[in-house]
Amino acid sequence: MPVVVVATLTAKPESRDAVRDICTRAIEQVHSEPGCQLYSLHESADTFVFVEQWSDTDALKTHSTAPAATALFRDVAEHLAAAPDVKVLTPVGAGDPAKGRLRS
């Protein structure tokens, strides 16, 4: 069963561009990781949100120690106003299945 992750990073106001650059550098490499079904970056002011979908928990575990994720969290740490907020989520089946969950 696919695993969905939402990771939120809050940049220091003066570090918004640095956080964006560090995050976008990781994306191409993460997209090539086994089991990556979705790895999408979104932003609003100083908040950056990754919406992720992995084929299974093993793929997510591999990603969490892969070079791209390791470098991202190492390089971004000094630019954040707070610790990253990472949530692993389970879909709630409701409504039209085609519209009520991420696609695998």
Tell me what each language-model feature is.
Residues 17-19, 60-62, 96-98:
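Short acidic, gly/pro-rich beta-turn/loop elements at beta-sheet edges
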